[in-house]
Amino acid sequence: LPALTEKDKVNIQLAIDEDIDFIAHSFVRSAADVKAVQDILDAHHSEIKIISKIENQEGVDNIDDIIDASYGIMIARGDLGIEVPIEQIPGIQRDIIMKCILKQKPVIVATQMLHTMIENPRPTRAEVTDIANAIYSYTDALMLSGETASGKYPLEAVQTMARIAETAEKDNHKRGYIDVPLSNTKSQREFLAKSAIMATEQVGVKCIITDSASGATARHLASFRGPHPVLAMCYNDKIQRLLNLSYGVLPVHLANHTDNEHMFMAAVRMMRQKGYIKLEDKIAYLAGYITNGGGTNFLEINTLKQVFDPNYKFHNTMSEK
């Protein structure tokens, strides 16, 4: 069977016309299936990102190549449970989540998360545990489907899932960051991102701030699953929306500033106003030199009190040259 039907192509064109952020590609069997969609997007110079839905054995077998070809992965457990032995689903879910973390790609766990809430106002204990276990595996996102599309209690389902996730994440934060090995790309940005995450545990950093033109630095930070928030200052709404899918990232669209110092101070004031950091807390700033057009190339750690000191000098002097 072809990866795309004529109806699929019509729907992709509609997504392009409406400037949709993501396309969820169903029943992906191989990287070639992903490429078939990507070729259409590229032909129209579209920046839409592909989320590949893993729903069959062939997709599971080719998961590494599919992850590489996709922006992110959705573990669609409903159809997957029909295509493969149902007792294998928990192990497949765990393995795919870890593969996505290692490859720094967003991963979504979906289908039958709170299935009983389609008809009932409260979930089963098993459903609560299922959601918590997905959080304990460090998934980037959870997705409801029938519960909100046709269920009797859509708002209650969202509120219930949010409460479970928030509670489970507190346990994750006690465990610290994941010691994910650096990739073989010898990326300076990746090295600095891991250093910033390690600082949350070894130096006591309470918040990481980064400016992100493409979202890449924020995604690097997300892959290490740190215990404290990452504030990503985005230059446009598109990147802000994409980063909503990344673990622990709080994307904020700020108007472009002329230098890193103004970006940094705007972010610090925002985080303090929201109550994420106190005057005595340490914060890390991970960024690149805006005027030089370079990538992420410096990491600075200070207390908030030091930053607000009138004598504080921002160390990124290269942006002024």
What are these regions (language model features)?
Residues L1-K321:
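Non-catalytic helical/linker scaffolds that mediate oligomerization, partner binding
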